[in-house]
């Protein structure tokens, strides 16, 4: 009986962990996936805009290596494909549907068909090309369904934002969003402190910084994502600081967002960290910033653009 009880407990734990892994994406999270995959896979050169326009209309063209890797990136971000196990994840489709079905108005029968279609796919070696070729027929048949489920239509997204004001809005920076979320009535004052990089060791300020770090994708439930922090230094043309940034973060005694934030602000890279953080704040109000071909033009230009953002 004891063994049976232990086995049941383990199975329940595994089920709970699996359920937690498939949390439905809200519009902000889906938008981030699309734009980050644009950033990572759009080619430079004259064809960049053509790729971007085509993908934004949910057309997986042209059928080439660039589009193949963009599709794999997007499927992984939307939790429809798992890179670690190299398998498609049909079980996540109804989870996403159930969370927003009152807004998307997609027929459950169509969702079931999409789920069944995904369940029959084989990712092969897991290469971009094999994942793309496996998924393309499913996409072509069910693009109308998946586009609604995964927040690809303007009308349904607008309804969700109206009904759920707790979701970060487009054109709202994560500094502004997190100040309001974590500091409530003191949001304006807290926003100023966040923008001015003042250290305020309070529970509210710590919560605000945790919100910002998660919004910037510096952290998730598994901990700090050092590569994401380093990436922001690279984007302000400070890739030479990578060893020092990694060293600062590795030697930080705490493990919370506020701790890492404080360590960076009290390190030799503090000024560059401020610049990187400012630049990410600007981009957090428009996830398509880099995909549109914009680049870092220095701290003064960033501050000038930040002034245009509404708190």
Swiss-Prot record:
One of its GO terms (molecular function) is odorant binding. This is Long form salivary protein D7L1. It comes from Anopheles gambiae (African malaria mosquito). GO terms for biological process: sensory perception of smell; vasodilation. Disulfide bonds join 37-73, 69-128, 178-211, 252-263. Gene3D superfamilies: Pheromone/general odorant binding protein domain. SUPFAM superfamilies: Insect pheromone/odorant-binding proteins. Residues 1-21 form the signal peptide.
């Amino acid at each position: 009986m004891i063994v049976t009880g232990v086995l049941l407990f383990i199975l329940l734990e595994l089920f709970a962990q699996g359920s937690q892994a498939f949390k439905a994406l809200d519009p902000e999270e889906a938008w981030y996936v699309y734009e980050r995959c644009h950033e990572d896979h759009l080619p430079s050169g004259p064809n960049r805009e053509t790729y971007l326009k085509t993908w934004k209309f949910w057309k997986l063209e042209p059928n080439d290596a660039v589009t193949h890797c963009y599709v794999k990136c997007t499927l992984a971000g939307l939790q429809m494909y798992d890179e670690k196990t190299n398998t498609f994840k049909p079980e996540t489709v109804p989870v996403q549907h159930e969370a927003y079905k009152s807004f998307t108005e997609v027929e459950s029968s169509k969702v079931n068909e999409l789920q069944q279609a995904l369940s029959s796919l084989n990712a092969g070696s897991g290469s971009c090309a094999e994942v793309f070729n496996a998924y393309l027929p499913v996409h072509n048949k069910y693009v109308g369904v998946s586009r609604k489920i995964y927040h690809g239509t303007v009308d349904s997204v607008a309804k969700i934002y109206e009904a759920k004001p707790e979701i970060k809005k487009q054109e709202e920076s994560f500094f502004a969003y997190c100040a309001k979320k974590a500091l409530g009535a003191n949001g304006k004052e807290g926003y100023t402190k966040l923008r001015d990089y003042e250290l305020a060791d309070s529970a509210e300020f710590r919560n605000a910084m945790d919100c910002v770090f998660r919004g910037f994708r510096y952290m998730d439930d598994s901990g700090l994502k050092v590569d994401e922090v380093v990436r922001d230094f690279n984007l302000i043309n400070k890739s030479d600081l990578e060893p020092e940034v990694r060293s600062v973060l590795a030697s930080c005694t705490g493990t919370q967002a506020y701790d890492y934030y404080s360590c960076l602000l009290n390190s030799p890279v503090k000024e560059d960290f401020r610049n990187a953080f400012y630049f990410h704040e600007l981009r957090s109000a428009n996830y398509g910033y880099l995909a549109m071909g914009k680049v870092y033009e220095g701290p003064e230009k960033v501050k000038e653009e930040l002034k245009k953002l509404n708190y």
